[in-house]
């Protein structure tokens, strides 16, 4: 058995907490203004009508209505139909 821990084993053993990213409200769901629709890093989804992007790229509803996922050119977009 080794009497020393080896190259880097004592320096390993850390991990960051999960960030709970992903789609929070799915297509067809009814949402209120201010509800978070998608939590993301970068713009995997882009904001469509009645949706804005927060500082951390989170998409949230500006108005109450029904969530719709679609395309805006080549981009995937999230909209809220009132």
From Swiss-Prot:
One of its GO terms (biological process) is translation. This is Large ribosomal subunit protein bL27. InterPro entries: Ribosomal_bL27, Ribosomal_bL27_CS. Keywords: Ribonucleoprotein, Ribosomal protein. The keyword Transmembrane helix does not apply. Belongs to the bacterial ribosomal protein bL27 family. Residues 1-21 are annotated as: Disordered. One of its GO terms (cellular component) is cytosolic large ribosomal subunit. It holds the Pfam family Ribosomal_L27. GO terms for molecular function: structural constituent of ribosome. It comes from the Bacteria.
